[in-house]
């Protein structure tokens, strides 16, 4: 079928769009690599269970990657570099075809054209996030055959193009539930829309206006520095104002901030896709139970023998379900949560599902599922939970991968209003109060309003709001502080984990008093078939170091001592055990993935690695 036939038909053009989406759902793509902890870790907020290993998986999280990593690439091209480039090429063909043959006065064709610009921009932004400087190819290879060997390009060229393309995408695509959106895409969080395009523009702009690890010259294979992407402060101010404008357009159109912080994650886990019911602006869609292992990699760990016994007992856990417990939150983040912050107990859990036939840990009935308390190093990320699913997972869970939500728009607006940490303050022409946007997020978390905006406040709020959502690493990178913050997180962790008793330690210019003991009780949850859940946990907040007055071991309360580790020496935090990184000097040099060797070999000299790879 020729291009004229395809791109003069709205129905066939949508099939071409679906072909671009399909590339995001392949092995070693978002279903089990890019959405599953192989990127984005370790940070000051999240760390990986693989950090202790020496295999190729561990190098993806400890800043020690090599150019022949088999965990994320293989020589047959089945990897994220190939898939993202294919998304770009398919979108190039759609854009060229619709521009040449399509009727862009037709609402559906305008929408599909805008969605192609949006998907291409997303793929390019992901490539810049993962690899830094990559080839820029904005025309289909059929139009420009020589571009098959496109040369590595300065990322600023791509950023400049994304500014144009995402504004065009936002112009062409209506709001998600607008009548002009084709019915197959209308009100679907898994399809492009104006708000998602504007939010992605703001995200890309903040990266562009910020800092990055950059080679001294594009051709320099070894020398690099952390610096601004460009020196023109007038341009930086213009871009910050573009962020304000883009975010304001979304904020003024709709209030999508969920009342309950857990709601966006419950909805993702329960297959909600209605845009007007969700805080998320866009998520990569996967077929239910057919593709995707988001739950298996991102949920709290369940032991291999327990998960078999729990099948059919806990909602969401079916035969063959997996739970790797890949991501835990760091103590450095845990003790930054203010008293009463509702986000803490959604973001992490102090226990993991187990199945016990012997009635231990205060359980008076046998053959029940229960949450088993764990040590501090295993406080797992908990935004993705089997018990929130509406169907049972049998391995490929098919949970959609969320990309951006409304809270990010609010906090990006607040950040841009003060110029982030660039020293450049833009003119706010939107009539929106940036402090109010940040305080909307704090109020939802159950916290008092902040009195004034500052970069430190922005940095802390983004940590507590977005941990585990594959955002933090790139925040730290664009602020130019990843190395400093990861080293701080390790020093703090080392300072508490080598102890066995409660202590007072410095944290971000303040002192926190940390308990070595937690107290909790169990309650039965009828929604979980009577499973026992840890409840009323005390001892994780600053100053919670003495037994609560209401503690009564005769009334179901339990005391877990020394959450740091063994009774003798606390948690053995030797470099071979759970490091954040292998070598401190590599924290800048290995922020980006290398271009894999087989692509360089086949590039006719147009690809190479920087940063001393």
Where are these regions (language model features)?
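An aromatic- and glycine-enriched ligand-binding surface/loop that stacks and positions planar moieties
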Residues: 1-61, 134, 138, 159, ...
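Conserved, well-structured interaction surfaces
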Residues: 9-10, 14-18, 22-28, 32, ...
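Flexible, polar/acidic helix-loop-strand segments at domain edges
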Residues: 62-64, 332-405, 605-613
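Long, intrinsically disordered, low-complexity segments
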Residues: 84-87, 161-163, 185-188, 268-302, ...
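Glycine-centered coil turns and helix-coil junctions that link the paired helices
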Residues: 97, 127, 134, 208-215, ...
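Structural helix-adjacent loops and short alpha-helical linkers that scaffold large soluble proteins
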Residues: 102-113, 213, 238, 421-433, ...
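Alpha-helical scaffolds flanking conserved acidic
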Residues: 106-119, 190-198, 453-455
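Extended amphipathic alpha-helical segments enriched in small hydrophobics
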Residues: 121, 201-203, 398-446
């Amino acid at each position: 079928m020729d291009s004229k036939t395809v791109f003069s038909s709205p129905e066939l053009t949508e099939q071409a769009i679906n072909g671009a989406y399909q590339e995001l759902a392949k092995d070693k793509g978002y279903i089990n690599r890019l959405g599953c902890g192989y990127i984005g870790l370790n940070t000051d907020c999240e760390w990986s269970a693989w950090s202790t290993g020496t295999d190729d998986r561990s190098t993806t999280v400890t800043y020690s990657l090599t150019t022949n990593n088999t965990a994320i690439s293989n020589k047959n091209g089945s990897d994220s570099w190939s898939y993202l480039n294919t998304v770009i090429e398919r979108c190039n063909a759609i854009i060229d075809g619709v521009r040449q043959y399509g009727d862009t006065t037709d609402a559906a064709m305008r929408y599909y054209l805008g969605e192609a610009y949006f998907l291409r921009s997303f793929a390019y932004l992901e490539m810049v996030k993962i690899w830094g400087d990559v080839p820029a190819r904005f025309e289909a290879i059929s139009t420009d055959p020589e571009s098959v060997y496109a040369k590595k390009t300065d990322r600023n060229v791509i950023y400049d193009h994304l500014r144009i393309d995402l504004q065009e995408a936002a112009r062409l695509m209506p709001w998600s539930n607008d009548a002009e959106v084709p019915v197959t895409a209308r009100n679907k969080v898994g399809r492009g829309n104006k708000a998602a395009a504007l939010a992605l523009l703001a995200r890309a702009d903040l990266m562009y206006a910020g800092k990055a690890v950059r080679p001294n010259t594009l051709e320099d294979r070894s020398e690099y520095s952390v610096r601004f992407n460009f020196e023109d402060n007038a341009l930086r101010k213009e871009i910050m104002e573009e962020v304000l404008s883009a975010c304001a357009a979304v904020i003024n159109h709709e209030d999508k901030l969920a009342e309950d912080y857990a709601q966006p994650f419950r909805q993702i886990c329960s297959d909600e896709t209605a845009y007007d019911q969700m805080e998320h602006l866009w998520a990569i869609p996967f077929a239910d139970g057919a593709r995707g292992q988001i739950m298996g990699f991102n949920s709290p760990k369940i032991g291999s023998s327990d998960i078999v016994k729990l099948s059919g007992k806990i909602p969401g856990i079916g035969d063959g379900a997996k739970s790797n417990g890949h991501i835990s939150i760091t103590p450095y983040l845990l003790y930054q949560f203010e008293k009463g912050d509702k986000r803490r107990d959604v973001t992490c859990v102090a226990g993991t599902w187990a199945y016990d036939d012997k009635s231990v840990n205060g359980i008076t009935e046998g053959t029940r599922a229960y949450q088993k308390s764990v040590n501090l190093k295993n406080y797992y990320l908990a935004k993705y939970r089997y018990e929130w699913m509406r169907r049972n997972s049998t391995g490929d869970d098919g949970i959609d991968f969320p990309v951006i939500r409304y809270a990010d728009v609010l906090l990006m607006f607040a950040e841009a209003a003060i110029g982030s940490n660039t020293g450049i303050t833009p003119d706010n022409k939107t009539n929106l109060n940036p402090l109010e946007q940040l305080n909307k997020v704090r109020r939802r978390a159950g916290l008092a309003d902040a009195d004034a905006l500052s970069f430190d406040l922005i940095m802390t709020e983004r940590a507590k709001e977005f941990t585990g959502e594959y955002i933090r690493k790139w925040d730290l990178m664009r602020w130019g502080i990843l190395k400093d913050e990861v080293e701080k997180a390790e020093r703090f962790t080392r300072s508490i984990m080598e102890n066995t008793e409660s202590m007072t330690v410095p944290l971000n210019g303040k002192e926190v008093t940390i308990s070595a003991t937690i107290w909790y009780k169990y309650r039965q949850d009828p929604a979980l078939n009577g499973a026992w859940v840890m409840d009323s946990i005390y001892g994780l907040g600053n100053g919670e170091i003495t037994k609560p007055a209401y503690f009564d071991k005769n009334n179901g309360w339990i005391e877990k001592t020394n959450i740091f580790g063994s009774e003798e020496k606390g948690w053995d935090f030797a470099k071979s055990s759970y490091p954040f990184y292998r070598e401190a000097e590599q924290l800048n040099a290995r922020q980006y993935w290398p271009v894999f060797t087989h692509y360089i070999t086949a590039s006719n000299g147009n690809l190479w690695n920087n940063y001393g790879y």
